[in-house]
Protein backbone atom coordinates (compact mmCIF):
# COMPACT_ATOMS: atom_id res chain seq x y z
CA UNK A 1 0.00 0.00 0.00
CA UNK A 2 2.83 2.39 0.88
CA UNK A 3 4.50 1.68 -2.45
CA UNK A 4 1.25 2.42 -4.29
CA UNK A 5 0.94 5.79 -2.52
CA UNK A 6 4.51 6.67 -3.48
CA UNK A 7 3.84 5.76 -7.11
CA UNK A 8 0.61 7.79 -7.08
CA UNK A 9 2.45 10.81 -5.68
CA UNK A 10 5.06 10.52 -8.44
CA UNK A 11 2.32 10.44 -11.08
CA UNK A 12 0.62 13.52 -9.62
CA UNK A 13 3.93 15.40 -9.54
CA UNK A 14 4.57 14.45 -13.16
CA UNK A 15 1.14 15.67 -14.28
CA UNK A 16 1.37 18.99 -12.43
CA UNK A 17 4.78 19.73 -13.86
CA UNK A 18 3.81 19.06 -17.47
CA UNK A 19 0.35 18.39 -18.83
CA UNK A 20 -1.50 20.36 -16.17
CA UNK A 21 0.90 23.32 -16.21
CA UNK A 22 -1.28 25.10 -18.74
CA UNK A 23 -3.28 28.31 -18.86
CA UNK A 24 -4.81 31.05 -20.99
CA UNK A 25 -5.96 34.67 -20.86
CA UNK A 26 -9.63 34.58 -19.90
CA UNK A 27 -10.24 38.34 -19.73
CA UNK A 28 -10.00 40.19 -22.03
CA UNK A 29 -10.75 36.99 -23.94
CA UNK A 30 -7.80 35.69 -25.92
CA UNK A 31 -7.97 34.36 -29.47
CA UNK A 32 -7.72 30.78 -28.22
CA UNK A 33 -10.33 31.24 -25.45
CA UNK A 34 -12.84 32.66 -27.97
CA UNK A 35 -12.50 29.37 -29.87
CA UNK A 36 -13.75 27.46 -26.82
CA UNK A 37 -17.40 26.93 -25.85
CA UNK A 38 -16.84 28.75 -22.54
CA UNK A 39 -15.61 31.72 -24.55
CA UNK A 40 -18.77 31.65 -26.66
CA UNK A 41 -17.19 29.83 -29.65
CA UNK A 42 -17.01 33.23 -31.36
CA UNK A 43 -13.89 32.22 -33.30
CA UNK A 44 -14.53 29.47 -35.84
CA UNK A 45 -12.46 26.82 -37.62
CA UNK A 46 -9.84 26.90 -34.85
CA UNK A 47 -8.89 23.23 -34.95
CA UNK A 48 -8.08 21.26 -31.82
CA UNK A 49 -7.49 24.34 -29.67
CA UNK A 50 -11.25 24.80 -29.37
CA UNK A 51 -11.20 21.88 -26.91
CA UNK A 52 -8.05 22.85 -24.99
CA UNK A 53 -7.35 26.61 -25.09
CA UNK A 54 -4.97 26.12 -22.17
CA UNK A 55 -2.47 24.37 -24.47
CA UNK A 56 -2.16 27.19 -27.00
CA UNK A 57 1.25 28.69 -27.70
CA UNK A 58 3.27 26.40 -25.43
CA UNK A 59 6.90 26.95 -26.48
CA UNK A 60 10.37 27.68 -25.13
CA UNK A 61 10.73 30.92 -23.19
CA UNK A 62 13.05 33.85 -23.98
CA UNK A 63 10.91 35.92 -26.38
CA UNK A 64 11.83 37.87 -28.47
CA UNK A 65 15.39 36.48 -28.72
CA UNK A 66 14.03 32.93 -28.57
CA UNK A 67 10.55 31.44 -28.29
CA UNK A 68 8.11 30.93 -31.19
CA UNK A 69 9.37 31.46 -34.73
CA UNK A 70 7.91 34.25 -36.86
CA UNK A 71 4.65 33.27 -38.52
CA UNK A 72 3.89 30.87 -35.65
CA UNK A 73 3.72 33.32 -32.76
CA UNK A 74 0.20 32.16 -31.87
CA UNK A 75 0.80 28.41 -31.91
CA UNK A 76 4.46 28.09 -31.05
CA UNK A 77 5.50 24.44 -31.21
CA UNK A 78 2.05 23.16 -30.24
CA UNK A 79 0.26 21.56 -33.19
CA UNK A 80 -3.14 21.88 -31.48
CA UNK A 81 -3.23 25.64 -32.17
CA UNK A 82 -1.68 25.92 -35.66
CA UNK A 83 -4.89 27.40 -37.11
CA UNK A 84 -4.45 30.42 -34.82
CA UNK A 85 -1.52 31.51 -37.01
CA UNK A 86 -3.95 32.54 -39.77
CA UNK A 87 -3.97 36.32 -39.93
CA UNK A 88 -6.21 38.73 -41.82
CA UNK A 89 -8.08 41.85 -40.76
CA UNK A 90 -11.38 39.94 -40.69
CA UNK A 91 -10.32 36.47 -39.51
CA UNK A 92 -10.78 36.81 -35.73
CA UNK A 93 -13.41 38.24 -33.39
CA UNK A 94 -12.29 41.60 -31.98
CA UNK A 95 -12.44 42.74 -28.33
CA UNK A 96 -13.23 46.42 -27.69
CA UNK A 97 -10.24 48.10 -26.05
CA UNK A 98 -9.11 51.57 -25.01
CA UNK A 99 -5.88 53.07 -23.75
CA UNK A 100 -5.33 53.23 -20.00
CA UNK A 101 -5.61 50.77 -17.08
CA UNK A 102 -6.79 47.29 -18.08
CA UNK A 103 -7.13 44.15 -15.96
CA UNK A 104 -5.76 40.88 -17.35
CA UNK A 105 -7.01 37.59 -15.91
CA UNK A 106 -5.16 34.33 -16.55
CA UNK A 107 -6.96 31.04 -15.94
CA UNK A 108 -4.81 28.07 -14.86
CA UNK A 109 -5.72 24.40 -15.14
CA UNK A 110 -3.47 23.66 -12.14
CA UNK A 111 -1.28 25.53 -9.66
CA UNK A 112 2.14 26.38 -11.10
CA UNK A 113 4.86 28.83 -9.98
CA UNK A 114 5.14 32.02 -12.04
CA UNK A 115 8.35 33.62 -13.33
CA UNK A 116 6.62 36.67 -14.82
CA UNK A 117 4.01 37.95 -17.27
CA UNK A 118 4.97 40.16 -20.21
CA UNK A 119 2.70 41.98 -22.66
CA UNK A 120 3.59 43.28 -26.12
CA UNK A 121 1.49 45.04 -28.77
CA UNK A 122 1.58 45.46 -32.53
CA UNK A 123 2.97 48.67 -33.97
CA UNK A 124 0.39 51.24 -35.05
CA UNK A 125 1.20 50.70 -38.75
CA UNK A 126 1.42 46.88 -38.72
CA UNK A 127 -0.11 44.90 -41.59
CA UNK A 128 -2.98 42.75 -40.22
CA UNK A 129 -3.10 40.72 -43.44
CA UNK A 130 0.37 39.22 -43.02
CA UNK A 131 1.28 36.40 -40.60
CA UNK A 132 2.40 37.93 -37.31
CA UNK A 133 6.18 38.34 -36.90
CA UNK A 134 8.53 40.10 -34.51
CA UNK A 135 8.65 42.98 -36.98
CA UNK A 136 4.88 43.42 -36.46
CA UNK A 137 5.36 44.03 -32.73
CA UNK A 138 6.84 46.69 -30.50
CA UNK A 139 9.39 44.37 -28.87
CA UNK A 140 9.60 46.45 -25.70
CA UNK A 141 6.87 45.03 -23.44
CA UNK A 142 4.36 47.67 -22.35
CA UNK A 143 3.79 45.75 -19.13
CA UNK A 144 5.87 43.34 -17.01
CA UNK A 145 4.33 41.67 -13.94
CA UNK A 146 6.85 40.00 -11.58
CA UNK A 147 6.29 36.37 -10.68
CA UNK A 148 5.56 34.59 -7.46
CA UNK A 149 4.31 31.31 -6.02
CA UNK A 150 1.69 29.21 -7.71
CA UNK A 151 -1.88 30.48 -7.61
CA UNK A 152 -4.11 28.79 -5.04
CA UNK A 153 -7.36 29.97 -6.66
CA UNK A 154 -6.85 28.71 -10.23
CA UNK A 155 -6.43 32.21 -11.65
CA UNK A 156 -4.60 35.47 -11.22
CA UNK A 157 -5.49 39.06 -12.14
CA UNK A 158 -3.24 42.07 -12.56
CA UNK A 159 -3.51 45.55 -14.09
CA UNK A 160 -1.50 46.96 -16.99
CA UNK A 161 -1.54 50.37 -18.66
CA UNK A 162 -2.54 49.98 -22.33
CA UNK A 163 -0.67 52.28 -24.77
CA UNK A 164 -2.47 54.57 -27.21
CA UNK A 165 -3.53 52.84 -30.41
CA UNK A 166 -6.25 53.09 -33.07
CA UNK A 167 -7.98 50.42 -35.11
CA UNK A 168 -7.22 46.70 -35.03
CA UNK A 169 -4.22 45.68 -32.91
CA UNK A 170 -2.95 42.43 -31.37
CA UNK A 171 -1.83 42.17 -27.74
CA UNK A 172 0.72 39.38 -27.26
CA UNK A 173 0.79 38.03 -23.71
CA UNK A 174 3.46 35.67 -22.35
CA UNK A 175 3.24 33.65 -19.11
CA UNK A 176 6.69 32.35 -18.18
CA UNK A 177 6.53 29.46 -15.73
CA UNK A 178 9.46 29.25 -13.32
CA UNK A 179 10.02 25.51 -12.92
CA UNK A 180 10.14 24.52 -16.61
CA UNK A 181 11.87 26.05 -19.68
CA UNK A 182 8.45 26.77 -21.19
CA UNK A 183 6.25 29.83 -21.73
CA UNK A 184 2.61 30.10 -22.80
CA UNK A 185 1.93 32.74 -25.46
CA UNK A 186 -1.61 34.10 -26.04
CA UNK A 187 -3.00 36.68 -28.45
CA UNK A 188 -5.82 39.16 -27.86
CA UNK A 189 -7.41 40.69 -30.98
CA UNK A 190 -8.21 44.23 -29.85
CA UNK A 191 -10.23 46.96 -31.58
CA UNK A 192 -9.50 50.57 -30.58
CA UNK A 193 -11.59 53.59 -31.55
CA UNK A 194 -10.42 55.81 -34.42
CA UNK A 195 -7.91 58.60 -34.02
CA UNK A 196 -10.65 61.26 -33.82
CA UNK A 197 -12.32 59.56 -30.90
CA UNK A 198 -15.65 59.82 -32.72
CA UNK A 199 -18.05 56.93 -32.35
CA UNK A 200 -20.04 56.08 -35.47
CA UNK A 201 -23.63 55.26 -34.60
CA UNK A 202 -24.90 52.42 -36.77
CA UNK A 203 -28.58 51.70 -37.34
CA UNK A 204 -27.64 48.02 -37.06
CA UNK A 205 -27.25 47.90 -33.30
CA UNK A 206 -28.67 44.53 -32.22
CA UNK A 207 -27.35 41.11 -33.22
CA UNK A 208 -29.94 38.30 -33.37
CA UNK A 209 -27.85 35.41 -34.65
CA UNK A 210 -25.12 34.31 -37.02
CA UNK A 211 -24.60 32.53 -40.31
CA UNK A 212 -21.82 30.11 -39.35
CA UNK A 213 -20.45 28.16 -42.34
CA UNK A 214 -18.93 25.09 -40.68
CA UNK A 215 -19.06 22.70 -43.65
CA UNK A 216 -19.06 22.59 -47.42
CA UNK A 217 -22.38 21.56 -48.96
CA UNK A 218 -23.32 19.41 -51.94
CA UNK A 219 -25.38 20.19 -55.02
CA UNK A 220 -29.05 19.93 -54.08
CA UNK A 221 -28.54 20.91 -50.44
CA UNK A 222 -30.82 23.70 -49.19
CA UNK A 223 -30.00 26.41 -46.66
CA UNK A 224 -32.79 28.37 -44.94
CA UNK A 225 -32.56 31.42 -42.71
CA UNK A 226 -35.57 31.32 -40.36
CA UNK A 227 -36.85 34.37 -38.42
CA UNK A 228 -38.70 34.43 -35.09
CA UNK A 229 -40.64 37.18 -33.27
CA UNK A 230 -42.68 37.10 -30.05
CA UNK A 231 -45.42 35.08 -31.75
CA UNK A 232 -43.05 32.42 -33.09
CA UNK A 233 -41.62 31.70 -36.53
CA UNK A 234 -42.31 34.16 -39.35
CA UNK A 235 -42.62 31.90 -42.38
CA UNK A 236 -43.14 34.95 -44.60
CA UNK A 237 -39.60 36.14 -43.84
CA UNK A 238 -37.73 32.91 -44.62
CA UNK A 239 -34.73 33.36 -46.93
CA UNK A 240 -33.62 30.23 -48.80
CA UNK A 241 -30.93 29.20 -51.26
CA UNK A 242 -30.31 25.87 -53.01
CA UNK A 243 -26.77 24.78 -53.84
CA UNK A 244 -26.34 24.30 -57.58
CA UNK A 245 -22.81 22.88 -57.77
CA UNK A 246 -19.62 22.20 -55.82
CA UNK A 247 -18.36 25.78 -56.13
CA UNK A 248 -21.57 27.23 -54.68
CA UNK A 249 -21.33 24.61 -51.93
CA UNK A 250 -18.02 25.88 -50.56
CA UNK A 251 -18.77 27.07 -47.04
CA UNK A 252 -17.54 30.62 -47.57
CA UNK A 253 -19.53 30.88 -50.81
CA UNK A 254 -22.90 29.68 -49.56
CA UNK A 255 -22.64 31.84 -46.44
CA UNK A 256 -21.98 34.90 -48.63
CA UNK A 257 -24.84 33.98 -50.97
CA UNK A 258 -27.30 33.54 -48.09
CA UNK A 259 -26.27 36.82 -46.45
CA UNK A 260 -26.47 38.67 -49.78
CA UNK A 261 -29.95 37.33 -50.48
CA UNK A 262 -31.11 38.37 -47.00
CA UNK A 263 -29.72 41.89 -47.50
CA UNK A 264 -31.46 42.19 -50.87
CA UNK A 265 -34.78 40.84 -49.53
CA UNK A 266 -35.40 42.69 -46.26
CA UNK A 267 -34.98 46.36 -45.35
CA UNK A 268 -34.77 45.98 -41.56
CA UNK A 269 -32.38 43.00 -41.32
CA UNK A 270 -28.75 42.77 -42.42
CA UNK A 271 -26.13 40.00 -42.41
CA UNK A 272 -22.39 40.46 -42.72
CA UNK A 273 -19.55 42.32 -41.06
CA UNK A 274 -19.94 45.84 -39.70
CA UNK A 275 -17.28 48.30 -40.84
CA UNK A 276 -15.99 51.45 -39.14
CA UNK A 277 -18.83 53.47 -40.69
CA UNK A 278 -21.50 51.19 -39.26
CA UNK A 279 -22.36 49.62 -42.63
CA UNK A 280 -23.05 45.88 -42.69
CA UNK A 281 -21.83 44.05 -45.80
CA UNK A 282 -22.11 40.35 -46.66
CA UNK A 283 -18.77 38.55 -46.45
CA UNK A 284 -17.28 35.21 -47.47
CA UNK A 285 -17.22 33.51 -44.07
CA UNK A 286 -19.12 34.04 -40.82
CA UNK A 287 -21.86 36.70 -41.08
CA UNK A 288 -23.49 38.28 -38.03
CA UNK A 289 -27.22 39.05 -38.38
CA UNK A 290 -28.37 42.51 -37.27
CA UNK A 291 -31.72 44.31 -37.02
CA UNK A 292 -32.54 48.01 -36.87
CA UNK A 293 -35.09 49.84 -34.72
CA UNK A 294 -37.94 49.07 -37.15
CA UNK A 295 -37.67 45.30 -36.76
CA UNK A 296 -39.50 43.14 -34.21
CA UNK A 297 -37.46 40.00 -35.00
CA UNK A 298 -35.94 38.44 -31.88
CA UNK A 299 -33.72 35.73 -33.31
CA UNK A 300 -32.60 34.02 -36.51
CA UNK A 301 -31.61 30.41 -37.14
CA UNK A 302 -29.86 28.67 -40.03
CA UNK A 303 -31.33 25.34 -41.14
CA UNK A 304 -29.51 23.05 -43.59
CA UNK A 305 -31.37 20.29 -45.43
CA UNK A 306 -28.86 17.82 -46.83
CA UNK A 307 -28.96 15.81 -50.02
CA UNK A 308 -26.81 12.64 -50.37
CA UNK A 309 -23.24 13.68 -49.55
CA UNK A 310 -20.44 13.47 -52.06
CA UNK A 311 -17.03 11.91 -51.59
CA UNK A 312 -14.42 13.68 -49.50
CA UNK A 313 -10.70 13.19 -50.10
CA UNK A 314 -8.41 12.85 -47.09
CA UNK A 315 -5.12 13.59 -48.86
CA UNK A 316 -2.63 16.12 -47.44
CA UNK A 317 -1.98 19.00 -49.80
CA UNK A 318 -0.08 22.27 -50.24
CA UNK A 319 0.02 25.18 -52.68
CA UNK A 320 2.33 27.90 -53.96
CA UNK A 321 1.58 31.21 -55.68
CA UNK A 322 3.86 33.38 -57.81
CA UNK A 323 3.82 35.92 -60.61
CA UNK A 324 2.62 38.95 -58.63
CA UNK A 325 4.24 42.31 -59.41
CA UNK A 326 5.47 44.66 -56.70
CA UNK A 327 3.37 47.53 -58.05
CA UNK A 328 0.47 48.14 -60.42
CA UNK A 329 -0.82 51.25 -62.19
CA UNK A 330 -4.58 51.77 -61.91
CA UNK A 331 -6.80 53.50 -64.45
CA UNK A 332 -9.99 55.21 -63.27
CA UNK A 333 -9.58 53.43 -59.94
CA UNK A 334 -9.54 50.00 -61.59
CA UNK A 335 -7.00 47.31 -62.38
CA UNK A 336 -6.63 43.54 -62.60
CA UNK A 337 -3.89 41.52 -60.92
CA UNK A 338 -2.63 38.26 -62.39
CA UNK A 339 -0.78 35.40 -60.71
CA UNK A 340 -0.33 31.64 -60.91
CA UNK A 341 -1.17 29.03 -58.29
CA UNK A 342 -0.07 25.41 -58.14
CA UNK A 343 -1.30 22.68 -55.79
CA UNK A 344 0.18 19.42 -54.63
CA UNK A 345 -2.87 17.32 -53.88
CA UNK A 346 -6.39 18.73 -53.62
CA UNK A 347 -7.00 22.13 -52.01
CA UNK A 348 -9.77 24.68 -51.75
CA UNK A 349 -8.17 28.06 -52.42
CA UNK A 350 -9.61 31.41 -51.41
CA UNK A 351 -7.92 34.64 -52.53
CA UNK A 352 -8.80 38.07 -51.11
CA UNK A 353 -7.29 41.48 -51.81
CA UNK A 354 -7.24 43.86 -48.83
CA UNK A 355 -6.80 47.62 -49.19
CA UNK A 356 -4.88 49.72 -46.66
CA UNK A 357 -8.10 50.28 -44.68
CA UNK A 358 -8.57 46.47 -44.55
CA UNK A 359 -11.63 46.54 -46.80
CA UNK A 360 -11.88 43.62 -49.26
CA UNK A 361 -11.46 44.83 -52.85
CA UNK A 362 -11.27 41.54 -54.71
CA UNK A 363 -12.20 37.89 -54.20
CA UNK A 364 -11.80 34.62 -56.05
CA UNK A 365 -12.00 30.97 -55.06
CA UNK A 366 -11.23 27.70 -56.77
CA UNK A 367 -10.49 24.03 -56.11
CA UNK A 368 -7.37 22.49 -57.66
CA UNK A 369 -5.98 18.97 -57.49
CA UNK A 370 -2.36 18.49 -58.56
CA UNK A 371 -2.82 21.35 -60.99
CA UNK A 372 -1.70 24.85 -61.94
CA UNK A 373 -3.99 27.73 -62.84
CA UNK A 374 -3.59 31.33 -63.94
CA UNK A 375 -5.76 33.60 -61.80
CA UNK A 376 -7.02 37.10 -62.56
CA UNK A 377 -8.82 39.33 -60.06
CA UNK A 378 -10.40 42.51 -61.47
CA UNK A 379 -11.00 45.34 -59.00
CA UNK A 380 -12.66 48.75 -59.06
CA UNK A 381 -13.01 51.64 -56.62
CA UNK A 382 -9.33 51.51 -55.70
CA UNK A 383 -7.17 54.16 -54.07
CA UNK A 384 -3.41 54.46 -54.38
CA UNK A 385 -1.44 52.77 -51.62
CA UNK A 386 -0.42 49.46 -50.13
CA UNK A 387 -2.59 46.39 -50.76
CA UNK A 388 -2.24 42.75 -49.71
CA UNK A 389 -3.22 39.59 -51.56
CA UNK A 390 -4.04 36.83 -49.03
CA UNK A 391 -4.43 33.26 -50.29
CA UNK A 392 -5.75 30.65 -47.87
CA UNK A 393 -5.64 26.98 -48.83
CA UNK A 394 -7.60 24.27 -47.01
CA UNK A 395 -7.22 20.54 -47.63
CA UNK A 396 -9.79 17.80 -47.07
CA UNK A 397 -8.61 17.28 -43.49
CA UNK A 398 -9.13 20.94 -42.61
CA UNK A 399 -5.43 21.78 -42.52
CA UNK A 400 -4.69 25.28 -43.75
CA UNK A 401 -1.84 27.18 -45.40
CA UNK A 402 -1.65 30.96 -45.85
CA UNK A 403 0.41 33.06 -48.26
CA UNK A 404 0.28 36.89 -48.10
CA UNK A 405 1.78 39.11 -50.82
CA UNK A 406 2.04 42.89 -50.49
CA UNK A 407 1.88 45.14 -53.55
CA UNK A 408 1.49 48.85 -54.26
CA UNK A 409 -1.25 50.46 -56.33
CA UNK A 410 -0.05 53.62 -58.06
CA UNK A 411 -2.27 56.55 -58.96
CA UNK A 412 -2.82 57.90 -62.44
CA UNK A 413 0.25 60.10 -62.74
CA UNK A 414 0.12 60.34 -66.55
CA UNK A 415 -3.05 61.17 -68.42
CA UNK A 416 -3.59 58.77 -71.32
CA UNK A 417 -3.16 60.24 -74.77
CA UNK A 418 -6.48 61.24 -76.28
CA UNK A 419 -6.58 59.84 -79.79
CA UNK A 420 -8.88 61.27 -82.44
CA UNK A 421 -11.89 59.07 -82.93
CA UNK A 422 -11.74 57.22 -86.22
CA UNK A 423 -14.72 55.21 -87.25
CA UNK A 424 -13.62 51.73 -88.27
CA UNK A 425 -13.70 51.01 -91.95
CA UNK A 426 -13.27 47.23 -91.88
CA UNK A 427 -16.56 45.71 -92.97
CA UNK A 428 -17.88 49.27 -93.20
CA UNK A 429 -18.51 51.56 -90.25
CA UNK A 430 -22.23 51.55 -90.74
CA UNK A 431 -22.26 47.77 -90.84
CA UNK A 432 -20.39 47.50 -87.51
CA UNK A 433 -22.67 50.08 -85.94
CA UNK A 434 -25.54 47.72 -86.56
CA UNK A 435 -23.88 45.14 -84.29
CA UNK A 436 -26.05 44.08 -81.33
CA UNK A 437 -25.84 46.00 -78.08
CA UNK A 438 -23.80 44.38 -75.31
CA UNK A 439 -25.90 42.49 -72.72
CA UNK A 440 -24.98 41.42 -69.20
CA UNK A 441 -27.09 38.33 -69.74
CA UNK A 442 -24.83 36.94 -72.48
CA UNK A 443 -21.27 35.72 -72.84
CA UNK A 444 -19.28 36.26 -76.04
CA UNK A 445 -16.88 34.31 -78.23
CA UNK A 446 -13.67 35.54 -79.86
CA UNK A 447 -14.25 38.16 -82.64
CA UNK A 448 -17.81 38.92 -81.50
CA UNK A 449 -18.61 42.61 -82.05
CA UNK A 450 -20.98 44.65 -79.87
CA UNK A 451 -21.92 48.28 -79.30
CA UNK A 452 -22.00 49.89 -75.85
CA UNK A 453 -22.38 53.54 -74.80
CA UNK A 454 -21.83 54.79 -78.35
CA UNK A 455 -18.67 52.79 -79.08
CA UNK A 456 -17.79 49.56 -80.86
CA UNK A 457 -16.00 46.71 -79.08
CA UNK A 458 -14.67 43.37 -80.34
CA UNK A 459 -13.96 40.45 -78.00
CA UNK A 460 -10.40 39.13 -78.29
CA UNK A 461 -11.37 35.80 -76.71
CA UNK A 462 -14.24 34.40 -74.66
CA UNK A 463 -15.81 37.14 -72.51
CA UNK A 464 -18.03 36.40 -69.52
CA UNK A 465 -21.12 38.35 -68.43
CA UNK A 466 -19.20 40.32 -65.80
CA UNK A 467 -16.69 41.79 -68.28
CA UNK A 468 -18.22 45.12 -69.31
CA UNK A 469 -16.84 46.65 -72.52
CA UNK A 470 -15.43 50.06 -71.75
CA UNK A 471 -14.35 49.22 -68.19
CA UNK A 472 -10.66 50.05 -67.88
CA UNK A 473 -9.81 46.72 -66.25
CA UNK A 474 -11.03 44.66 -69.22
CA UNK A 475 -10.81 47.01 -72.24
CA UNK A 476 -7.79 47.42 -74.56
CA UNK A 477 -7.58 51.01 -75.84
CA UNK A 478 -4.09 50.80 -77.39
CA UNK A 479 -5.50 50.63 -80.91
CA UNK A 480 -3.14 47.80 -81.88
CA UNK A 481 -4.49 44.93 -79.79
CA UNK A 482 -1.46 44.83 -77.48
CA UNK A 483 -3.32 45.42 -74.20
CA UNK A 484 -2.34 42.29 -72.26
CA UNK A 485 -5.03 40.50 -70.30
CA UNK A 486 -7.89 42.70 -71.55
CA UNK A 487 -10.71 40.83 -73.24
CA UNK A 488 -12.43 43.71 -75.08
CA UNK A 489 -10.78 45.83 -77.80
CA UNK A 490 -12.09 49.37 -78.36
CA UNK A 491 -12.66 49.77 -82.13
CA UNK A 492 -13.76 53.39 -81.96
CA UNK A 493 -16.92 55.47 -81.92
CA UNK A 494 -20.05 54.19 -83.55
Swiss-Prot record:
GO CC terms in record: extracellular region
Domain Chitin-binding type-4: start-end pairs: 22-192
Chitin-binding type-3 domain span: 435-484
One MF term in the entry's GO annotations: chitin binding
GO BP, sorted A to Z: carbohydrate metabolic process
First and last residue of the signal peptide: 1-21
Bridged cysteine pairs (disulfide): none
Keyword entries, A-Z: Chitin-binding, Secreted, Signal
Region (Disordered): 474-494
Keyword Signal applies: yes
A Pfam family matched in the record: GbpA_2
Location in the cell: Secreted
Purpose: Probably interacts with GlcNAc residues. May promote attachment to both epithelial cell surfaces and chitin.
PANTHER family xrefs: CHITIN-BINDING TYPE-4 DOMAIN-CONTAINING PROTEIN, GLCNAC-BINDING PROTEIN A
Record-stated family: Belongs to the GbpA family.
This protein's name: GlcNAc-binding protein A
Name of the coding gene: gbpA
